[in-house]
């Protein structure tokens, strides 16, 4: 869960009434990812030992699915460690998907940078640029979904527009 705080020195911020929409499933989000995505090949290849551990984790499951003689995780390990995404449900929050080992729903590996971006609702042409794969992965993890970003942008632009132009019909804000 994320908390967004918007403060204003120019007046009270009015939030529009929220409408609840059914979020995309992991399968729906990943369906649009193909080789044309900019960071398509930015992926961590796990060791053979790690792939063996991953093979035990069922969709929606986590490290607890791994037999103790293979696992090496303690009882206080967080539930999102070695978590395989369920293809038929919305994704969990993607914090650092590399460090937590957030698993692809069908393959024994973590998500690629482009797959994580697609789950966040980001577009194909958005580029994560760094010499470091882990830095690219962290860039995605540090973000918010595109829907949240657009919502915050529109709330802030509306207030700035009202402050600058008043609440007239000549408003300059374009909601995307």
Regions found by a protein language model. Give the residues of each.
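S-adenosyl-L-methionine-dependent DNA methyltransferase catalytic core
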Residues: 2-176
